[in-house]
Amino acid sequence: WNWMDQLVTFGHSLPEHEMGIVDCALWDLFGRTVNLPVSVIMGGARKKVKAYASSFPNIGKPDDYAEHALQCKRQGYKAYKVHAYICWDPHKWEPAPQQPGFPKEDVEVCRAVREAVGDDMVLMLDPFGVYTLEESIWVGRQLEDLDYYWLEHPMIETRSESYRRLTDALDIPILAPEHIPGGVFTRAEWILHKASDMLRIDHNFGGITACQKMVAICQAYGLKCEMHGGGWANSQILGATTEAVCEYFERGLLRPGFDYETPPPYLEAICDPLDDDGNVILPTGPGLGMELNWDYINDNLVKDQGMILKI
């Protein structure tokens, strides 16, 4: 891991997300070799984790978000995260650059959702980093009145000083950073400078090994960290941590009419089946726990210079 990290940091010859892929693959290989889930190898703290429903952006009007949140509540979810109105790039799955946020409209959505689901559902907002500092403070104060749990990643993350000022100005916890590179080292600096109240961690930034380190740092400082996104690797990390440190599994993105429960054709099952109480049942198979559909994969191989490998 340290060797790969030096390639990322000094040589720039290995992209950080590719380092994460390699690290996760090595953990998967280790787990399959000893016939244990990675989460058990790392300590095995739990077999299920509370889930929150994470919405797609731009679902519709505030009433559409409210109805979707109610549907999720009826399905068993105890928490719901709003991704509201964003100038969205559908090809990159990220906000289009240099486009404004819509803080007033976002708050209308947040208010409609709270009124619909009542006081017994945990709610969060993620504006995808499109607000200014002034907008973030204003939205945060509205969310405090609506009893939202956290405000996630409201501004771009290249200016940690803006985040420090934001955390000073608000009582609602700020969850960040989400996308800034640097993995464990960047996030340690954010804790040191009090730029966020809760840490966002992700296997894409250094893999499972880096997430282990980030969890340990949060434990040392008495802070919570939350996994960004779902997936097999994040499932294993959550299985190795307690609810006191990493509370939720992010399940989504979800929208009305979207089939989340059917696995893609190259997999035998999804990684995050939901029970009736709104918990994700974590994988129990060896390694990362995924089972590949080799019949589908072999039937859909792409020929390369006349040679293909069948498993």
What are the language-model segments listed below?
Residues A25, F30, A66-R74, G289:
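Short amphipathic alpha-helices and their capping/turn segments at secondary-structure boundaries
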Residues R141, D147, T158-N279, P283-P286:
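Shared catalytic-loop signature of beta/alpha-barrel
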Residues K48-V49, A53-R164:
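Metal-dependent enolase-superfamily TIM-barrel catalytic cores that perform enediolate-based chemistry
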Residues F30-G31, C72, V117, T167, ...:
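A generic structural signal for well-ordered alpha-helical segments
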